[in-house]
Amino acid sequence: VYGLDASEYLLFAASTDNACPPQASINSQGLWDELSEADLAQSRVAYSLALASNVLSRADELHAAWAVDEGNFVADFANAGLGNSVYSTSQEALNDLSDALFYVEKVVKDYKLARPIGILGCSQITCPENVESRFSRMSKEAIIANLQAAHHIFTGAQGEETSLGLEDYLVSVEGGEALALPMVESLTQTVAALEGMDSTIYDAVAEEG
């Protein structure tokens, strides 16, 4: 298992049990029981280092793909429909940009929120075990980061700066302003509401259940 979710478990989960079935050799042969707390801690450290190295490598690859002096995908996007861009038309680039925003609906709304609060894929009142980052209790911060990224994509701006983004394109299209401005306002208000929460999402969901 690779990724930040595995790293989270290694760093924050307190259990010293394993989830392997009884017939697995590590359990059936008593290998797990032979491990001391120090052995388990050392194994967690070693695995965490391997995971961190993998995440760093993937992050470097992503950065290189966009970097002007390397993959320069930013030029492909900016010059969509021109020259050697991977996009044959500017509309294709805009479609990719708008598709990326559906992460908020499909993942943030339906997966990160609807599942734990009992709306989707949950047979109980709430399912706190479905909360993202439940071991570190960092789900709220992760969702805030997702929404801030969506705001950045939509407006082209980060923080207090001003820039051109998908919002400006929609405003320039007849009837588009009625969609663009409420989206910006909704993203801003949702981030503010999350930042104003006193508890973690896990604790809030568990309390409701």
Where are the regions a protein language model picked out?
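Mature extracytoplasmic or organellar-lumen-exposed domains after removal of signal/transit peptides
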Residues: 1-209
